Regions:
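Conserved RecA-like P-loop NTPase helicase motor core
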Residues: 613, 625-635, 686-754
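A substrate-engagement module of RecA-like helicase motors
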Residues: 116-132, 137, 185-187, 191-320, ...
């Protein structure tokens, strides 16, 4: 074999130099192939001795080449060489052995030859798009974007492409990525920020592509497991009515009975989105699928499990649609187990498209943020033991477990366990009281002398040390720590005793209590991490609401660029980042730096801007009321009501009315609903219908007015005259005094930057 058929002259020379500088010993190289499959660049990963070298596969990306030299000149691979090559070959990697002079080569696993694509045959007057859809308008900008992505696939490069509104970017990225994946038997992930865009892709764009490409391929929308009903949790709930039930309990049991009927007679998927009515999060959390509450194959409902049935369908799919949050949840698992793993949420993938890519930084930062709150603490403690409802299955996991133990143990065994249970409950009550006391004092501390209904404040322990209320918080926290230690001892003793009886636990009552105990330990760690506030690189802050008194405590990382670079961008190359808003001053430097792409120097990143085909000056107008009250004024929304009513009437509805909070949405909806006749207008309020139904109602109604929050700010496709205006009550920009924004600005200035 000729070395030049596999490695470029420059790369060969670089390897000779590195081998020479290593004293002729073994060197482990990463080989980076060009678009033709020739290794054009090499990077030293490890150096060894005359007979071996460390093979650090975790440093390699997909579709690269591991190269090492045999100083003896005998290029026959060892058993270890073959084993490592086999492992890397499973993810599309190649493996070569060379001699020290790099003029002889042994190819253990050849580099996979990728079939290149050309989208030209699909565009133009005689293209497949025009043939299938004569009225389908191919825009020049759309074709231009598709060609950029075609090149990034063929050349194995990352691409950042800003595509203005109206480009038709979903078709522009779906066509080349799907063509490339189908031709080369690869898997594509499309990650979006909004459910609206996911539904547009699945219900409109992808079926359209199927007709254009004329190739059969599978695609799935991958939802988080929390969207699926858990049969074990559902059927473990006692729904028999008791005379002592409160009205709230009766209502909840009725909803659970409806869910049981829905599961038995209606749904095939168990997807919450299929429900024809809204259900509160607090009730859904009692019946939804959760990773730590899942018994897997040991569950009696495993064969009929909605979540696992959904997961079986994604294994064979060429295209998977996910949201950004799920993508980063999956990435966190890969960070712990290795990028190419069998333990991740998503199957291993080859191509990633980030649509609505401007949200990546915030989504990743939110995912790596620690959070606790008074409400979540109370809910978790209530799931373990609800002291307000002690005589039913709603009394918490320990009550359900004791009911099961009473049926499964002898009276002597049960009596022993019951004593230990009483010790646990006594300490649970102490722990709960101390925790709530801390949260209540924090609410007072952060809302003192502040009349706003929502307060965001940075927690500066140095400044707060002189505050009496804060000192009281820290004193109670010492007691909270002590109670936690006692609680752990008592629960461990209780669980050890129960575990010694080797019960079958088919329904999972012991399993459920153990899982809630693990959650409690994780919750306490997060709480102490935030309250102690010692870790560098985080901003510690609080969000207080005074209407329904609650305080949320956060620890948010300043910078997530290293996390993304190390765990994602260095692992693969065929990635597309697209949105209508990525560039600043026609450059992508700010965006690349914010998410870690600026650190990516091994491969060139293509950067393109595709202008919008819209003539904004002729096709739209912007109206701003100059006499509106300041948005911080409590009368702000009431003051806007007349202006908004006039604006809606000017277009006879056909408008989106968008808000940054549910309270503002509900207030304005109640103000306006009596002013618009039901015969003339159709008012559609978020939470009255599932999101996808809201869009369908809007598209097919007379003079529609949609009241929505962040779900409708982007990723919504309503064509033609049905949507004439968008009314934005407040721009959803971060204010400079937002604790996280403020901390990021401080950190930038600290580094001598603007």
């Amino acid at each position: 074999m000729k070395v030049a058929e596999f490695i470029s002259a420059k790369a060969m020379e670089d390897m000779r130099l590195e081998i020479s500088e290593s004293g002729g010993n073994e060197v482990f190289f990463r080989g980076i192939p060009d678009g033709e499959g020739i290794v054009s660049e090499v990077e030293v990963i490890a150096r060894g001795n005359s007979s071996s070298v460390a093979a650090l596969l975790n440093m390699m990306r997909k579709n690269e080449v591991i190269i090492h030299n045999h100083p003896s000149g005998v290029l026959i691979p060892s058993d270890e060489d073959v084993s490592i090559s086999s492992m890397y070959g499973e993810v599309g990697g190649a493996s070569y052995i060379v001699n020290n002079a790099v003029d002889d080569i042994y190819v253990i696993v050849p580099l996979k030859e990728f079939i290149k694509i050309d989208v030209d045959e699909y565009f133009g007057e005689n293209g497949a798009i025009h043939k299938n859809f004569g009225k389908f308008e191919v825009r020049r900008e759309q074709y231009e974007m598709a060609k950029f992505i075609e090149n990034s696939m063929n050349e194995n490069k990352k691409l950042i492409v800003e595509a203005g509104t109206g480009t038709g970017k979903t078709i522009a990225y779906l066509l080349p990525t799907l063509l490339y994946a189908i031709e080369n038997n690869l898997k594509v992930i499309v990650s979006t920020n909004t459910i609206n865009l996911q539904e547009q892709l699945v219900n409109k764009d992808i079926p359209l592509l199927k007709k254009i490409i004329d190739e059969d391929f599978n695609y799935q929308i991958v939802k988080g497991r929390g969207n699926y009903l858990c049969k074990r949790k559902l059927y473990n709930i006692d729904v028999t009515e008791k005379e002592t039930d409160t009205e709230e309990e009766k209502t909840e049991k009725n909803i659970i009975r409806n869910l049981i009927d829905w599961d038995k007679n209606v749904t095939r998927t168990g997807d919450r989105n299929e429900l024809k009515y809204e259900i509160s999060n607090s009730i859904w959390e009692k019946v939804n699928s959760e990773a730590d509450m899942c018994k897997g194959v040991k569950c009696p409902y495993y064969s009929k499990c909605h979540f696992f049935n959904a997961r079986k369908n994604i294994a064979d799919a060429t295209l998977l649609i996910v949201n950004h949050h799920m993508f980063f949840a999956d990435l966190a698992i890969r960070n712990q187990t290795g990028f190419y793993t069998n333990y991740s949420i998503l199957p291993n993938y080859d191509i990633v498209v980030f649509d609505e890519a401007h949200n990546i930084e915030d989504t990743a930062r939110n995912y790596f943020t620690f959070e606790t709150s008074k409400i979540s603490f109370g809910r978790l403690m209530g799931n373990i033991y609800n002291r307000r409802v002690v005589n039913s299955s709603n009394g918490g996991a320990i009550v359900r477990l004791m009911t099961y133990l009473n049926e499964s143990l002898s009276s002597e065994e049960y009596e022993k366990v019951d004593e230990l249970k009483e010790d646990v409950i006594a300490e649970l009550n102490v722990f709960y009281d101390k925790g709530i006391d801390i949260f209540d004092k924090l609410i007072y501390l952060f809302s003192e002398n502040n009349d706003n209904r929502e307060i965001k404040i940075k927690i500066d322990k140095q400044k707060m040390r002189s505050n009496k209320a804060f000192r009281e918080v820290m004193e109670i926290n010492s007691q909270f720590k002590e109670s936690y230690g006692n609680l752990v001892i008592r629960i461990n003793k209780f669980l050890n005793t129960v575990s010694n009886y080797n019960l079958e636990d088919k329904e999972g009552f012991l399993f459920e209590f153990s899982r809630y105990y693990e959650r409690l330990k994780q919750y306490y760690k997060k709480f102490e991490f935030i309250l102690e506030g010692k870790e560098e690189g985080y901003v510690y802050w609080a969000n207080v609401t005074t209407v329904r008194p609650n305080v949320k405590l956060y620890a948010t990382p300043f910078d997530i660029s290293d996390e993304l670079n190390d765990n994602l961008f260095t692992k693969m190359d065929r990635m597309v980042f697209t949105s209508a808003t990525l560039a600043v001053d026609n450059k992508f430097d700010y965006y690349k730096k914010s998410i870690g792409l600026m650190k990516e120097n091994r491969r060139k990143i293509d950067e393109r801007i595709v202008k919008s085909p819209f003539d904004y000056e002729k096709q739209m107008k912007v109206y701003i009321p100059e006499d509106a009250l300041d948005p911080t004024n409590i009368e702000f929304m009431r003051d806007l009501t007349g202006f908004i009513e006039e604006a809606i009437r000017s277009t006879k509805g056909h408008c989106f009315l968008l808000f940054t909070s549910y309270s503002a949405l509900n207030f304005l909806y109640n103000q306006l609903k009596s002013r618009f006749s039901e015969k003339e207008y159709t008012l559609i309020k978020q939470n009255d219908f599932p999101r996808h139904e809201m869009i369908e109602i809007f598209k097919n109604s007379k003079n529609p007015i949609l009241f929505g929050t962040d779900s409708f700010w982007e990723g919504v496709d309503v064509q033609g005259e049905q949507l004439k205006s968008v009314i934005i009550t407040k721009l959803p920009f971060k204010v400079p005094n937002d604790p996280v924004t403020e901390a990021i600005i401080e950190n930038i200035r600290k580094n001598g930057q603007n």
